[in-house]
Curated annotation (Swiss-Prot):
Alphabetical list of SMART domains matching this protein: TBOX
UniProt protein name: T-box transcription factor TBX2-A
Any matching Pfam family: TBX2-3_TAD
Organism per entry: Xenopus laevis
Compartmental location: Nucleus
Function, in words: Transcription factor which acts as a transcriptional repressor. May also function as a transcriptional activator. Binds to the palindromic T site 5'-TTCACACCTAGGTGTGAA-3' DNA sequence, or a half-site, which are present in the regulatory region of several genes.
Gene Ontology, cellular component aspect: chromatin; nucleus
High-level lineage: Eukaryota, Metazoa, Chordata, Craniata, Vertebrata
Keywords: Coiled coil, DNA-binding, Nucleus, Transcription, Transcription regulation
The record's note on its domains: Repression domain 1 (RD1) is involved in transcriptional repression.
Swiss-Prot/TrEMBL GO biological process terms: cell fate specification; positive regulation of DNA-templated transcription; regulation of transcription by RNA polymerase II
Coiled coil: 655-679
InterPro entries, per database record: p53-like_TF_DNA-bd_sf (IPR008967), T-box_DNA-bd (IPR046360), T-box_sf (IPR036960), TBX2/3_TAD (IPR022582), TBX2_3_RD (IPR048387), TF_Brachyury (IPR002070), TF_T-box (IPR001699), TF_T-box_CS (IPR018186)
Annotated Basic and acidic residues bias: 340-361, 378-403, 412-430, 676-688
Gene from which this protein is expressed: tbx2-a
């Protein structure tokens, strides 16, 4: 609580003041502080001590005329003509003023309060707010404040503290800030705290808005004034009660110098968006979007590094950890060569061998079509898949750069393993149905958990940059997710900044994948084998290639990473989807989806007509052979369309066998042409 620093005289107004310069000329009250009040009225400092004699001079004063020409002979005149400017009858009051938010002001004062000033004006924080008591309830008061220089020094911030740097610059014009509610009764002022939060500080000396003009790097002291008057015009003739709070002094700066002050303002000012990470600006929103994905990426990398294999035992993967990972490394050599040397005994590069396997798998499947419950046969297959060594398909780069000896060795390895695959296929579930083939190669993402897609699954697939793409539309329940290549243009610029087309080849091997496993493409390399090619994520991590889970936003700055993951994405896998390893998931023909300069092996999945993918139903259990005429690479033998299969579940094994033989012949013709023209530039045809 403060008593008046300058207690007024007993008489509120006396006409015979000494002709001295006033602390604040009339222009400080009217012209500068409140532009709406008599902007042309400028009174000389000594004019307030000269009483006016008659009504004509009083009218001149009210009209805003300059009064410096008034002679000394008017001093003896009576004051009845200015009776309207005299104060009302004397009232008894004893104003007391308390500073609001004093604790916060003390915190700032202890460090050294700084207030930013700008050309356009900046508000103070903490705002100057006081609570007034002891006023006369009926009398009217004008409340105002001003900011004056605390000393005649200029300061600088050096070695984390403020020190004197020289003499002060010439003082800026003084301006009073009159509270917008003035004049008001004492009862109104005492009802609530009086806030001067709209006061703005500026360093623009030619400011026209009535802001308080200050010099940067100078110390200032705010002052609060109470004037008992019922009209703004009475201010020059009224007694000022002035209150000073030393804890509110500050140094004016154009930018905060002390980091502690900056942090205090961030912690306490709800409008300090410029410093805060969380805000409504685009920059802050971008940070908010990237933070969760970065945290998820770090957690998943750590989890996959520590126990990627332990996740393999989960039959129902969490929606945030999908069983598909996209290869993120552009260098083919460490992954592809290791793949060829380590487990290509299971991966076939021979198209003819693949054709034979397709026929065998087609013959081995039962004609009965139904969805088997998630029971022991599936778990057996899962166990077999886990017991086998990690498998990966050969990449387009290794096929492109490899020599004929590599092909021959792979073919011999494939011949050794063909019989075991055929035996495994004969034991497989009767549920893997043959679905009618299209003339293009649709990308299929099988699901492997309860056969319904909820909104949470779709949210977990929301890729950064791909959420609005047309092939990420909501799916109907109970069906595999089909991404048809005809739905997006597969040109070299199909995905922005792409050129990593071979990453699209990362497809799931549906039912036998674990949370921590990365499934690679089976296109042209083992389509009919029952063991899906996958390798553990921790192996990639050991080579320095982090592999985040598919769920959530990809933290990588490359859009082609997200694009590859989108095209090759797998949802949490349905228990009825063990059919894919036994089906010719990716056909035996040469790579289909292609980007220059990479070859992309993507095959034809066993699917119904794409028009029926949204309808829940059983898989069609017929022949497992895939259509050969869907190669996007121009070949010497034209594509021979095969009649589409019926969608009914009553397809006979004979018809399936006949179609399989026809397709085998077409595949053989196509493969012979591709073998002779392996070096033809890819990607010249587009899907129809």
């Amino acid at each position: 609580m403060r008593d008046p620093a300058f207690p007024g005289a007993a008489m509120a107004y006396h006409p015979f003041h000494a002709p001295r310069a006033a602390d604040f000329p009339m222009s400080a009250f009217l012209a500068a502080a409140q532009p709406s009040f008599f902007p042309a009225l400028t009174l000389p400092p000594a004019a307030l001590g000269k009483p006016l004699s008659d009504a004509s001079l009083a009218g001149a004063a009210e009209a805003g005329l300059h009064l410096s020409a008034l002679g000394h002979h008017h001093q003896a005149a009576h004051l009845r003509s200015l009776k309207s400017l005299e104060p009302e009858e004397e009232v008894e009051d004893d104003p007391k003023v308390n500073l609001e938010a004093k604790e916060l002001w003390d915190q700032f004062h202890k460090i050294g309060t700084e207030m930013v000033i700008t050309k356009s004006g900046r508000r103070m924080f903490p705002p100057f707010k006081v609570r007034v008591s002891g006023l006369d309830k009926k009398a009217k008061y004008i409340l105002l404040m001003d900011i004056v220089a605390a000393d005649d020094c200029r300061y600088k911030f050096h070695n984390s503290r403020w020190m004197v740097a020289g003499k002060a610059d010439p003082e800026m014009p003084k301006r009073m800030y009159i509270h917008p509610d003035s004049p008001a009764t004492g009862e109104q002022w005492m009802a609530k705290p009086v806030a001067f939060h709209k006061l703005k500080l500026t360093n623009n000396i030619s400011d026209k808005h009535g802001f308080t003009i200050l010099n940067s790097m100078h110390k200032y002291q705010p002052r609060f004034h109470i004037v008992r008057a019922n009209d703004i015009l009475k201010l020059p003739y009224s007694t000022f009660r002035t209150y000073v709070f030393p804890e509110t002094d500050f140094i004016a700066v154009t930018a905060y110098q002390n980091d502690k002050i900056t942090q205090l303002k961030i912690d306490n000012n709800p409008f300090a968006k410029g410093f805060r990470d969380t805000g409504n600006g685009r920059r802050e929103k971008r940070k908010q979007l990237s933070l969760p994905s970065l945290r998820m990426y770090e957690e998943q990398c750590k989890a996959d590094r520590d126990g990627a294999e332990s996740d393999a035992s989960s039959c129902d993967p969490a929606p945030g950890r999908d069983s598909l990972h996209s290869p993120l490394s552009a260098e083919p050599s460490p992954l592809r060569l290791h793949r060829n040397n380590r487990e290509e005994k299971f991966g076939a590069d021979s198209d003819q061998e693949l054709d034979r396997r397709e026929i065998r798998s087609a013959r081995s499947h039962s004609p009965v079509g139904h969805r088997s419950p998630p029971s022991s046969p599936r778990l057996e297959d899962r166990g077999k898949d886990k017991s086998t060594p990690e498998k990966k398909s050969d990449s387009p780069e290794s096929r492109k750069d490899g020599s004929d000896s590599l092909f021959s060795s792979i073919r011999s390895l494939e011949k050794d393993k063909a019989e075991s695959r055929r035996k495994e296929d004969s034991k497989s579930d009767p549920e893997c149905g043959s679905l009618s083939k299209e003339t293009f190669a649709p990308l299929m993402v099988q699901t492997d958990s309860p056969p319904h897609l909820s909104a949470s699954h779709l949210q977990s697939l929301a890729l950064s940059g791909l959420h609005g793409q047309q092939f990420f539309n909501p799916l109907n329940a109970g069906q595999p997710l089909f991404i048809h290549p005809g739905q997006f243009t597969m040109g070299p610029g199909a995905f922005s900044a792409m050129g990593m087309g071979h990453l699209l080849a990362s497809m799931t091997g549906a039912g036998a994948l674990d949370n921590g496993s990365l499934s690679s493409v089976q296109g042209a390399t083992g389509a009919a084998n029952p063991f899906p090619f996958h390798f553990s994520q921790h192996m990639l991590a050991s080579q320095g290639i982090p592999m985040p889970a598919f769920g959530g936003l990809f933290p990588y700055p490359y859009t082609y990473m997200a694009a590859a993951a989108a095209a090759a994405s797998a949802m949490p896998a349905t228990s009825a989807a063990t059919t894919m390893p036994r089906n010719p998931f990716l056909s035996s023909t040469r790579p289909r989806l292609r980007f220059n300069p990479y070859q992309i092996p993507v095959g034809i999945p066993p699917s119904t007509n794409l028009l029926t993918t949204g309808l829940p139903g059983s898989l069609n259990p017929g022949s497992e052979s895939s259509k050969p005429g869907s190669s996007r690479e121009s070949s010497p033998i034209p594509d021979t369309p095969v009649p589409k299969r019926s969608h009914s579940n009553s397809l006979s094994p004979k018809a399936s066998m006949k179609d399989s033989i026809n397709e085998l012949q077409n595949i053989q013709r196509l493969v012979s042409g591709l073998e002779s023209q392996r070096e033809i530039s890819p990607g010249r045809e587009t899907p129809k």
